[in-house]
Amino acid sequence: MAEWSTVTATPDGNIAYTISLENADKNQCDVSDPAPTTRSTGTRLIISGIDGICEDDVSFAQLEDTMLKAFAWYLYLNKDKKIVLTINGTELDYRKYINTDASVEKEILISRIPFKIALIVWNEKITENFSVYFLDEEGVVRSKDTTTFNRNTVNFNHSVFVTSPFFLGRDGITLKGKRVELDGQTALNEYDEDKKVLKELSKEIQDVIEESLHKHMAAQVDKAIARMEARDS
C-alpha cells in the first residue's frame, strides 16, 4: 500500500487530504475529503505491505541517488522557499549533484515580461545535460530545448531553467523560434512579437552560459597548474 498525506495552502488556509493506493488495484486510488489543518504544507509518502521489499530496499542509501537525479534541480530552484525532500527523516542534499558555486541565477525583463534564468552546473554528467527547460510561474515545465553547448568537450555539464509567465499557454517553444504553439488563434503580429522575445531570451541565456563557461575553464586551468606543480615538488 502507498499513502500520500498532503497539506496544501489555499486562500482560506491550509487543508489536508490523503491519497491511498492499494496493492490489489494499482489503477484506482482513494482520495479523502480535504479538511482544515494548522500543519505546514508538504507531502509525506508511506509505503507498506509490499511483498518482496524489505526496509533496506527503501533506505536512504538505496534511494538517495535515484531521488537526487530526479529532483536535485527542483530542490535548487525552490531553495528560497525552503522546500526539502526527506527519506525516512534524512534530508536530501542537492549539492551532491549541483555545483552551487558555478551555478548562476539572473532575473531580466524583455518587453516588460519578467524572466528568471537559472543555469545549473552539474558535478558530473547526467542524462539531461545541455537542456533548456521553460517553466510557467507555477513551476510547470511547458517546453524543452537544447543549448548551443550540447556538443562541448570541456566537461561543462549544465542545464538551464527559465521561469516566466510568458510560457503559460505557449507549448513547444524553441529558442530558434521555429515552433511556437499558442492557445487558440494567434495573430501574425503577436507571433512576430513572440519571436522577438525568444530571440532576446536566447541571447541572454547564451551570455549566462558563456560567462559561466569561461569561469569553469579558468578554474580547470588553475587545477591543472596546481597538479603539475604538485608533481614537480
Give residue ranges: language-model regions.
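A general structural signal for short secondary-structure junctions and capping/turn motifs
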Residues: 1, 34-38, 74-77, 107-110, ...
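A broadly used, surface-exposed interaction patch
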Residues: 18-25, 91-129
